[in-house]
From Swiss-Prot:
Organism: Corallus hortulanus enydris (Garden tree boa)
PROSITE patterns membership: CYTB_CTER (PS51003), CYTB_NTER (PS51002)
GO molecular function ontology, one term from the record: metal ion binding
Record's keyword terms, sorted: Electron transport, Heme, Iron, Membrane, Metal-binding, Mitochondrion, Mitochondrion inner membrane, Respiratory chain, Transmembrane, Transmembrane helix, Transport, Ubiquinone
InterPro entries (UniProt xref): Cyt_b/b6_C, Cyt_b/b6_C_sf, Cyt_b/b6_N, Cytb/b6-like_sf, Cytochrome_b, Cytochrome_b_C_euk/bac, Cytochrome_b_N_euk/bac, Di-haem_cyt_TM
Recorded topology in the membrane: Multi-pass membrane protein
Transmembrane parts of this sequence: 25-45, 69-90, 105-125, 170-190, 218-238, 280-300, 312-332, 339-358
Any GO BP: mitochondrial electron transport, ubiquinol to cytochrome c
Cross-referenced Pfam families: Cytochrom_B_C, Cytochrome_B
Name this protein carries in UniProt: Cytochrome b
Family label: Belongs to the cytochrome b family.
This protein's encoding gene: MT-CYB
Binding residues annotated for heme b b566, in chain numbering: 89, 188
């Protein structure tokens, strides 16, 4: 039977013996994706995409729908878990040179952009105070595009300001984009298995492989159990830990929050945007903070794939990781000294990591005389 052959192939799928826990985040992302689609469907059943009713419908889900509080918290906290997993997944790709599998890396970066768009549209849907103002600030960046900007913004809003048509189309986009993410995820996995996974040493894995099942199946299941336990603990004891207090009040276009900020997983990009005192420059830096990942396969000059044996690049990588956290922190602070200076320095170091990658590679090759 074809399905039996498929299962047999999956069981016999050869995988490198030495891949570590950092390789488990792909399966964790797949689980997060399934969870988001499932909980999202049940929320969409009870949600009303209307500016007068959206906020009330979310309150209704939380209070009146059986297990609605669980669905809503799982969906909101699941998004945070999704981004934690994807950022670790990307960091692992950067550290161990997985980006040299070009097609997989480029499809993965496209997936990240689609995921960020989906999460942004989802953040607007509850029509809370922070949802409304974050949407206003971010969509307004389109006006920085010369000639086309104003037209594109009006088209996206469905009018001359954020209103009912905006919420309707954001809901439609939030509903449809996950299906694109699922399609791209399938493509991502297919492209990965054309060449196979890399390993921590960055060497050819063909000399030492074991079947995927049962070894890696149980390893994946263990990490999934840890993730789901953490997720359920968070929604049970700290359901509002990532929520903004302003979002518990209905959107009011006449009252601006003291400090407008998006969800925590966008703060690094938002921090880079705010660090540049120019609208177009900030918008370009925001786009480049994600798009620069696309350059990695083309700027790798070192003869070694993994950073495991590259001490200079290890130092650069961990500086980059610390910078990511610093920018996230500064983005939560008001636009005033010393936070503006810290975010500008951190943004510069963030981009320096990608610029220094080929230079470090050349230096290492010279030192090793290869």
């Amino acid at each position: 039977m074809p399905h039996q052959q498929m299962l047999m192939l999956f069981g016999l799928l050869p995988v490198a013996t030495n891949i570590s826990t950092w390789w488990n985040f792909g399966s964790m992302l797949l689980t997060c994706s399934a969870l988001q689609v499932l909980t999202g469907f049940f929320l969409a059943v009870h949600y009303t995409a209307n500016i007068d009713l959206a906020f009330s419908s979310v309150v209704h889900i939380m209070r009146d729908v059986p297990y609605g509080w669980m669905m809503q918290n799982l969906h909101a906290m699941g998004a945070s878990m999704f981004f934690i997993c994807i950022y670790i997944h990307i960091a692992r790709g950067l550290y161990y040179g997985s980006y040299l599998n070009k097609e997989t890396w480029l499809s993965g970066t496209t997936l990240l952009i689609m995921l960020m768009a989906t999460a942004f549209f989802g953040y607007v849907l509850p029509w809370g105070q922070m949802s409304f103002w974050a949407a206003t600030v971010i969509t307004n960046l389109l006006t920085a595009i010369p000639y086309l900007g104003t037209t594109m913004t009006t088209w996206l809003w469905g009018g001359f300001a954020i209103n009912d048509p905006t919420l309707t189309r954001f809901f439609a986009l939030h509903f449809i984009l996950p299906f694109g993410i699922i399609s791209f995820s399938s493509l991502h996995v297919m492209l990965l298995h054309e060449e196979g996974s890399s390993n921590p040493l960055g060497t050819n894995s063909d000399i030492d492989k074991i079947p995927f099942h049962p070894y890696h199946t149980y390893k994946d299941l263990f990490m999934l159990s840890v993730m789901i336990t953490l997720l359920l603990t968070m929604i049970s004891f700290y359901p509002d830990i990532f929520n903004d207090p302003d979002n518990f009040s209905k959107a009011n276009p006449l009252v601006t929050p003291q400090h407008i900020k998006p969800e925590w997983y966008f703060l690094f990009a938002y921090g880079i945007l705010r660090s540049i005192p120019n609208k177009l420059g900030g918008a370009l830096a925001l786009a480049m903070s994600i798009m620069i990942l696309l350059t990695m396969p083309f700027t790798h000059t070192s003869k070694l794939r993994s950073m495991m044996f590259r001490p200079f690049m290890q130092l650069m990588f961990w500086t980059f990781a610390a910078t990511f956290l610093v920018i996230t922190w500064t983005a939560t602070k008001p636009v005033e000294p010393p936070f503006t200076m810290i975010s500008q320095v951190a943004a510069l170091i963030y981009f320096l990591f990608f610029i220094s990658n080929p230079i470090m590679g050349w230096m290492e090759n010279k030192i090793m005389k290869v």
